[in-house]
Regions:
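S-adenosyl-L-methionine
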Residues: 1-55, 65-72, 93-121
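Conserved SAM/SAH-binding beta-strand->alpha-helix loop
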Residues: 85
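Conserved beta-strand/loop positions that form the S-adenosyl-L-methionine
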Residues: 59, 82
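Class I SAM-dependent methyltransferase "Motif I" SAM/SAH-binding loop
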Residues: 60-64
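A short glycine-rich, Lys/Arg-flanked "PGG" loop and its adjoining helix->strand segment in the class I
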Residues: 146-160
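Conserved beta-strand signature within the Rossmann-like core of class I S-adenosyl-L-methionine
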Residues: 161-168
Length: 227
């Protein structure tokens, strides 16, 4: 079985801020009763879950609309979600249990740490990152997750032909990400029509609906790993 690729990062600020969000009673009940069933943290458990399967990784899945949709539409796949906020995890656990989904696992930790330390090389087919924090203030741009180092890390974890699917409502962030991929010959740009039905027909997330209501422009970047 392939081993996790070691990429060395300089110490830098996290791309998220830990906060105590409100957790509903339903979310709390799901966290208490379903944690051991769906949450994985050990490298061996993650490797066993994704080994030899079509695997999608949803980074920062929020309320889990895309995560649940993918698990339902591709029951032959494994869907791994990375999320640091317990409210979103609680929502997903409740939905997954109600729908009797067996092909979902959740990792409650920083996505960069997960990729660097626990995901085997060349093991992921699709990575999704929808509406990550854009850190709009210039002094906070260093906190943005997608940097040149992160793209190299993504490359090492995706299979050849694997896809990175990114959405943001912040034009400056989109332009920055677009330039990074354009400068890297290991990636080829795709359009929505190039994707499978399970990726074309995902529901709008709650954040996406809010952005549309506020008339913020939605920007999409889809790239395929070619080298």
């Amino acid at each position: 079985m392939p081993q996790a690729h070691k990429v060395t990062f300089s110490k830098k600020p996290k791309s998220f801020v830990t906060r105590r969000g409100r957790i509903t009673s339903n979310q709390r009940n799901a966290l208490d009763s379903l944690w051991n069933q769906y949450i994985v943290s050990e490298v061996s458990d993650i490797k066993e879950f994704i080994s030899g399967k079509y695997t999608l990784l949803d980074i920062g899945f929020g309320a889990g609309e895309t995560l649940i949709s993918l698990a339902e539409s591709r029951k032959d796949s494994t869907v791994l979600g990375a999320e640091v906020y317990l409210s979103g995890i609680g929502s997903v656990l409740s939905k997954a249990d109600n729908l009797k989904l067996k092909n979902i696992r959740i990792v409650n930790e920083d996505a960069e740490d997960l990729l660097q330390q626990k995901i085997p090389d060349h093991s992921i087919d699709v990575v999704l990152m929808f509406y990550p924090d854009p850190w709009p203030k210039r002094k906070h741009h260093k906190r943005r997750l997608i940097k040149k180092e992160f793209i190299k890390l993504l490359n090492s974890k995706l299979k050849t032909g694997g896809i990175f699917y990114f959405k943001t409502d912040w034009k400056d962030y989109f332009n920055e990400v677009s330039c990074l991929f354009k400068e890297d010959s290991d990636w080829k740009e795709l359009s929505l029509k190039d994707l499978g039905e399970h990726l074309r027909n995902m529901p709008s997330t709650s954040f996406e609906k809010k952005a549309m209501k506020a008339k913020r422009l939605l920007n999409t970047k889809i790239v395929e790993k070619v080298n």
